[in-house]
Swiss-Prot record:
Signal peptide: none
Name of the featured protein: Trigger factor
Similarity comment text for this entry: Belongs to the FKBP-type PPIase family. Tig subfamily.
Keyword Nucleus listed: no
Entry's localization field: Cytoplasm
């Protein structure tokens, strides 16, 4: 076997391989012997068919199969010998084959980039320092009560957290536009569902009033014909409602799994959940900054084959989220996923190099801790832990999570890490 390697462009490589004629003939004869042992041909007993008959009937197909097998096997031998690491599926380009002569073919593919980590000392990470205060717990209890609240009619003016039922009709330059009209539209104030100025224009009015508000559509609005346009909305305010918050009764508290039904028990449970969310948010914030810094400090070429593969993964995930099938996933435009796919490939390559250079392996205690932390959010944590322990795929996924955390910690060990005091709400809003 003769081998030559050339760079086509960037990460592209072409390996040209020549297989000696006698190697091909030896392999063909060997395979024909195997075929002769198995085939049945009228007039001959099984295994007693003359080789010339077998060769005449099966020689062409056997030769083709043997060539395919030799091309694959010799390519693998070549890249092992040349210490080449292909990324993605190779493209075989066979040359002209003539029986009795050497056979030359080429294989085109991309290789993984050579990654040499640098600039880790320049990465800056700001670690949030947060504690869950009594006021934070009070705020979460208020949120829980609001989620369970009943709505009752209100005689007064619309306030920031009320709910209104309205008819509205919008126009630009005196002309109504598509989607600008609705009847009996229920709007919970303060959730940012409408364009800027819409809710503000309703506040202070009472049920039964009809009025006009002036707003301007944002420049980034999805409808091209409305971007940046001034509009008028005629509003008929039909109903105003306010929340009627439930009291923290024993019955109410038990809905949240607090068996003794006490306020103290509920506060303890809420605090525990908030601290779990907080720990995850701090980890994610630090990890995000570390990875951003790692990517910024290390520009690398990315094999197109890996990006294409990642785009397919993102397409399937998107289709699953929206109830689509495999075919619909493939029809989604690649432009929707290309940037995210490239980012994921780059991050994977860089963290992979961190893992390799630091000889990291998933720490069993960390894996156990991650599973227990995740399971604590469920009603029966021990059942969840047991389920993970009996599922190889889930355990492998959790080991990958642990290994990624360890890689991020290796980056942080060399980065410039500072601390910044912040509040629970500020941090959680950054995560949203």
């Amino acid at each position: 076997m003769q081998v030559s390697v050339e760079t086509t462009q960037g990460l592209g490589r072409r390996v040209t391989i020549t297989i000696a004629a006698d190697s091909i003939e030896t392999a063909v004869k060997s395979e024909l012997v195997n075929v002769a042992k198995k085939v049945r041909i009228d007039g001959f007993r099984k295994g007693k068919v003359p080789m010339n008959v077998v060769a005449q009937r099966y020689g062409a197909s056997v030769r083709q199969d043997v060539l395919g097998e030799l091309m694959s096997r010799n390519f693998i031998d070549a890249i092992i010998k040349e210490k080449i690491n292909p990324a993605g599926a190779p493209n075989y380009v066979p040359g002209e084959y003539k029986q009795g002569e050497d056979f030359t073919y080429s294989v085109e593919f991309e290789v993984y980039p050579e990654v040499e980590l640098k600039g880790l000392e320049t990465i800056e990470v700001e670690k949030p320092v947060v504690e869950v205060t009594d006021a934070d717990v009070d705020g979460m209890l208020d949120t829980l009560r609001k989620q369970q609240a009943n709505w009752k009619d209100k005689d007064g003016a619309v306030d920031a957290e009320d709910r209104v039922t309205i008819d509205f009709s919008g126009s630009v330059d005196g002309e109504e536009f598509e989607g600008g009209k609705a009847s009996d539209f229920v709007l919970a104030m303060g959730q940012g569902r409408m364009i800027p100025g819409f809710e503000e224009g309703i506040k202070g009015h009472k049920a039964g009033e009809e009025f006009t508000i002036d707003v301007t559509f944002p420049e980034e609005y999805h409808a091209e014909n409305l971007k940046g346009k001034a509009a008028k909305f005629v509003i008929n305010l039909k109903k105003v409602e306010e929340r009627e918050l439930p009291e923290l009764t024993e019955e109410f508290i038990k809905r949240f799994g607090v068996e003794d039904g006490s306020v103290a028990g509920l506060r303890a449970e809420v605090r525990k959940n908030m601290e779990r969310e907080l720990n995850g948010a701090v980890r994610n914030r630090v990890k995000s900054q570390a990875i951003d810094g790692l990517v910024k400090a290390n520009e690398i070429d990315v094999p197109a084959a890996l990006i294409d593969s990642e785009i397919d993964v993102l397409r399937r995930q998107a289709a699953q989220r929206f109830g689509g099938n495999q075919q619909q996933a493939l029809e989604l435009p690649r432009e929707l996923f290309e940037e995210q796919a490239k980012r994921r490939v780059v991050v994977g390559l860089l963290l992979g190099e961190v893992i390799r250079t630091h000889e990291l392996k998933a720490d069993d205690e960390r894996v156990k801790g991650l599973i227990e932390e995740m399971a604590s959010a469920y009603e029966d944590p021990s059942e969840v832990v047991q389920f993970y322990g009996s599922n190889k795929e889930l355990m492998d996924n959790m080991r990958n999570v642990a290994l990624e955390e360890q890689a991020v910690e290796a980056v942080l060990a060399k980065a410039k890490v500072s601390e910044k005091a912040t509040s629970f709400n500020e941090l959680m809003n950054q995560q949203a």
